[in-house]
Amino acid sequence: MSQIDKASRRQKIKDRSRKQVHGNEKKPRLCVYRSLSQIYAQLIDDDNGKTIMSVSSMSKENRALEGTKCDVCRIVGLQLGEKAKAQGITKVIFDRNGFRYHGRVKALADGAREAGLVF
């Protein structure tokens, strides 16, 4: 499968799922983006069009993390869950953003669940 086919496939899946996935202030959307070497996660309030918080493997505290990419993703998920609980958010809607629920995306989701987020 060529790179163009992968990108268009992911975009189609993303567009299809975005019709059903919608977050609000009390139950925001947990959006995940996975690049080749990094991972980014955001809690988004779609009603107001605002990002409530974001955590990534590129943030200052996470740059020095060692281990496999999946280990780093799990830690990012834990950090996101802890920040969300500090703001009083316990329930979220998971948006895998067209990526397969496997590997690093699953590790981030598992880390967020370990921290106490429900989805």
UniProtKB/Swiss-Prot annotation:
MF terms in GO: 5S rRNA binding; structural constituent of ribosome
Keywords linked to the UniProt accession: Ribonucleoprotein, Ribosomal protein, RNA-binding, rRNA-binding
GO term, biological process aspect, one: translation
Xref: CDD domains: Ribosomal_L18_L5e (cd00432)
Entries under InterPro entries matching the protein: Ribosomal_uL18_bac-type, Ribosomal_uL18_bac/euk
GO cellular component terms, semicolon-separated: cytosolic large ribosomal subunit
Chain spans, region Disordered: 1-26
Coiled-coil residues: none
Gene3D superfamilies documented for this protein: 3.30.420.100
Biased composition (Basic residues): 9-21
Pfam families in alphabetical order: Ribosomal_L18p
HAMAP family: Ribosomal_uL18_B
Cited PANTHER family: 39S RIBOSOMAL PROTEIN L18, MITOCHONDRIAL (PTHR12899), LARGE RIBOSOMAL SUBUNIT PROTEIN UL18M (PTHR12899:SF3)
Family of this protein: Belongs to the universal ribosomal protein uL18 family.
Stored NCBIfam families: L18_bact
Function: This is one of the proteins that bind and probably mediate the attachment of the 5S RNA into the large ribosomal subunit, where it forms part of the central protuberance.
Assembly mode: Part of the 50S ribosomal subunit; part of the 5S rRNA/L5/L18/L25 subcomplex. Contacts the 5S and 23S rRNAs.
Name the record gives this protein: Large ribosomal subunit protein uL18
